Regions:
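Histidine-centered divalent-metal-coordination microenvironment in nucleic-acid enzymes
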Residues: 124-128
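Short beta-strand segments
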Residues: 86-89, 140-142, 146
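Surface-exposed, glycine-biased beta-strand/turn segments
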Residues: 18-77, 81, 106, 116, ...
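Secretory targeting and sorting signals
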Residues: 2-24
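Short glycine/proline-centered loop/turn elements that form peptide/ligand docking sites
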Residues: 97-98, 110, 116-123
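Short, solvent-exposed loop/turn segments that connect beta-strands within catalytic domains
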Residues: 72, 133-139
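Short histidine-centered loop motifs in beta-beta connectors
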Residues: 49-51, 57-58, 67, 84-108, ...
Length: 159
């Protein structure tokens, strides 16, 4: 009896952890892109440098909850809800290619293109991952690296 309870507990733990880690992907469609500034105190995101105009894709499937311009220094941005209180936000885009309410597929749907809108210095995507709706009173940002599965190549320099 004890073994079966432990087996069930282990299976539930795996079921809760794996979707967040395994089902995500590198958000910039360029093999020469890299993390130019990592998640740390004072910078609660990963900045991914890439040539202007490079496609930006979601790290995970979900539904767009915001797409457009905001005056928060993020410029053109897209926010995606992935379920279970997980959101990803992509800032400094050249423009957005999706609209609010649209379903997006991991690595397949173009959210926009890399740009330097808002207060950006140089072309990059500022990627944030949130637990809770972005900028909500009980929400907080988590390290995006924990949700990116970059495959067999590692497009980063400062990790």
């Amino acid at each position: 009896m004890r073994r079966s309870i432990r087996a069930i507990a282990a299976a539930l733990t795996v079921a809760l952890i794996l979707p967040a880690v395994v089902l995500s992907a590198w958000p910039v469609a360029d093999r020469h892109s890299y993390i130019s500034q990592a998640f740390k105190t004072g910078h609660r995101a990963d900045d991914i440098a890439a040539p202007g105009g490079t496609e930006v894709v979601p790290i995970k499937a979900g539904r767009v909850v915001f797409a457009g311009w905001k005056r928060n220094c993020g410029g053109y941005q897209v926010w995606v809800a992935h379920g279970n209180g997980l959101y990803s936000a992509y800032y400094h885009l050249r423009s957005e290619s999706v609209s609010k309410g649209q379903n997006v597929k991991r690595s397949q749907t173009r959210l926009g293109r890399v740009g330097h809108s808002g207060c950006a210095k140089g072309t990059h995507v500022h990627l944030e991952v949130w637990r809770g709706f972005p900028w909500g009173s009980k929400s907080y940002r988590v390290d995006p690296w924990k949700y990116i599965n970059s495959g067999t190549w590692l497009p980063y320099r400062y990790r």
